[in-house]
Structures are given as structure tokens and as C-alpha cells.
Amino acid sequence: MAMAIDGYECTVCGDCEPVCPTGSIVFRDDHYAIEADSCNECTDVGEPRCLGVCPVDLCIQPLDD
């Protein structure tokens, strides 16, 4: 499973990018996105780190299959 950023909710603050241990959060086309193929939902710490720093509720959610 992977996480996804809602482009409508994202304020483009950039807080999530530096905390991603896999480098899965990228800035392209004027918004942040999570590359699903490399996102592991930070399984080593129990919760995605991006969720802990994002100031917007429901901006980052599990990716729908």
C-alpha cells in the first residue's frame, strides 16, 4: 500500500518532502505527489511520517487501489 496527496487539499507547504525516508514525495507540475512504487507507508515506525507533519487534515490518505 502507499499514500497519496490530495492536490485540492494540499497547500504546497513542503513539510512532507524532507521527512520521507524513501524520497517518495516529489514536487512536480506545481504540486506534491507521492510515488506509489517506492512509498512503504513508513512501516518501520508504524505511521507514515508525512501524516505527522502535514498541517491539513485529510490531505494525505492511503492510495485507493
Curated annotation (Swiss-Prot):
PROSITE patterns for the chain: 4FE4S_FER_1, 4FE4S_FER_2
Keyword Transport assigned: yes
Needed cofactors: [4Fe-4S] cluster
Domain 4Fe-4S ferredoxin-type: start-end pairs: 2-30, 32-65
Cofactor note: Binds 2 [4Fe-4S] clusters.
Example GO biological process: nitrogen fixation
UniProt keyword terms in alphabetical order: 4Fe-4S, Electron transport, Iron, Iron-sulfur, Metal-binding, Nitrogen fixation, Repeat, Transport
Name by which UniProt lists this protein: Ferredoxin-like protein in vnf region
InterPro entries assigned: 4Fe4S_Fe-S-bd, 4Fe4S_Fe_S_CS
Molecular function terms, GO-annotated: 4 iron, 4 sulfur cluster binding; metal ion binding
UniProt source species: Azotobacter vinelandii
Positions contributing to [4Fe-4S] cluster 2 binding: 20, 39, 42, 50
Keyword Phosphoprotein among UniProt keywords: no
Listed Gene3D superfamilies: 3.30.70.20
